[in-house]
């Protein structure tokens, strides 16, 4: 936290900070012209230290009008922060494991954030113990009713959607404001049997344009309420081939895609991957998570934009792909291999490392895994590589079995 007064600082980002209420008091004391604050908190303790107003200017002189809070796990800490910032007009908050309903939100907003106009939030929590589908739905309806009051619907026109499912004997829910405002798509992992409801009219389709990261699964969009969604700004995507017919209605364009991780369980779907590559002109990184071993990736795919390859995938037996000398040569001669600047790969022999370095002319960073790189070896692999490679290459052992080589 700052120890000197700053009269010029207007925008501040604090990431992964384990903080308490008193820290915030000192922060705002030292930054009287702060307008926007982004805080990502690591704290999950019930910090309930009293807020001392003498550390602060008068409330009406506080300049912060926009606040973004991510990974919040302490209700007292969040409430203390709201008390310090009564001039907030725009609030975005992501909360985990805190049970908050619409009535509690209303009380905090009325008491501490009277000027709030734009409110975006997402809460993931275990609502109660799961009993059966009918009882679970009743519990969700009771919870959602707190967001259907005149304060939410008429006065502010703030609407929410809720997903719920059973997980480890608990009724797990995710509730968020509409339009959706966060980077990750708001569904639980492997949650094939989720249900969803909203406080807005069923014929209103709100935007999910903020979503940048998606692990695509067809079951995610089986509910009618989500089947009309379009995710037009995806930057990081993972999926398994073959993709279904619904994929391109959900993700109609891939112009913004930068990173793709793909699983290919059979060889019959290679053309489908090439079709995806053809639609992604800005794709920088391609990773193979799982694929058949009759031919090692990246096969014969082409893409003029890919500069990073991650070939450390698995075969159907959950064994990591290991490239031999011949396969390394084929890789270096492939279209994507020729233009590759960053490569992650596992090799069978140290000679493969030299083969890659000398034959991939555009390569600048190599993350290489070699199972037999062990402390007990007679010859240290790093020293061997230093002997055979030009001095322009730096060699770092991240750990035994994983070496990073850069030029």
Feature map (PLM): residue ranges:
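Eukaryote-biased activation of long, low-complexity terminal tails and linkers
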Residues: 1-407
């Amino acid at each position: 936290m700052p120890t000197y007064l700053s009269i010029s600082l207007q925008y501040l980002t604090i990431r992964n900070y384990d903080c308490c209420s008193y820290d915030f008091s000192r922060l705002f004391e030292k930054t009287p012209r702060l307008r926007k604050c982004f805080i990502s908190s690591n704290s999950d303790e019930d910090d309930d230290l009293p807020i001392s107003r003498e550390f602060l200017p008068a409330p009406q002189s506080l300049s912060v009008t926009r606040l973004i809070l991510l990974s919040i796990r302490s209700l007292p800490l969040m409430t203390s922060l709201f008390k310090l910032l009564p001039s907030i007009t725009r609030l975005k908050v992501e909360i985990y494991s805190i049970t908050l309903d619409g009535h509690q939100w209303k009380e905090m907003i009325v008491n501490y954030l009277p000027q709030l106009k734009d409110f975006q939030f997402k809460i993931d929590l275990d609502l109660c113990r799961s009993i059966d589908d009918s009882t679970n739905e009743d519990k969700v309806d009771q919870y959602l009713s707190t967001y259907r009051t005149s304060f939410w619907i008429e006065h502010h026109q703030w609407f929410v959607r809720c997903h719920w499912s059973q997980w480890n004997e608990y009724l797990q829910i995710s509730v968020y404001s509409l339009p959706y405002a966060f980077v990750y798509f708001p569904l639980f992992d492997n949650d094939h049997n989720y249900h969803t409801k909203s406080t807005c009219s069923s014929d209103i389709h709100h935007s999910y344009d903020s979503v940048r990261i998606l692990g695509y699964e067809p079951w995610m969009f089986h509910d009618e309420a989500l089947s009309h969604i379009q995710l037009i700004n995806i930057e990081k995507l993972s999926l398994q081939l073959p993709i279904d017919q619904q994929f391109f209605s959900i993700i109609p364009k891939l112009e913004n895609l930068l990173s793709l991780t793909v699983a290919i369980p059979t060889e019959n779907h290679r053309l489908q991957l090439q079709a995806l590559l053809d639609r992604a002109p800005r794709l920088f990184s391609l990773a193979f998570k799982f694929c058949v071993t009759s031919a090692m990736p990246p096969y014969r795919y082409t893409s003029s934009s890919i500069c990073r390859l991650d070939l450390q995938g698995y075969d159907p037996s959950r064994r990591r792909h290991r490239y031999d000398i011949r396969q390394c040569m084929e890789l270096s001669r492939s279209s994507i291999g020729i233009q590759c600047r960053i490569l992650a790969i596992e090799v069978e022999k140290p000679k493969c490392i030299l083969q890659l370095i000398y034959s991939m002319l555009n390569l600048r960073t190599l993350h290489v895994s070699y199972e037999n790189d062990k402390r007990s070896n007679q010859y240290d692999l790093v020293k061997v590589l230093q002997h055979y490679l030009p001095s322009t290459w730096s060699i770092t052992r991240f750990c035994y079995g994983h070496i990073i080589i850069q030029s």
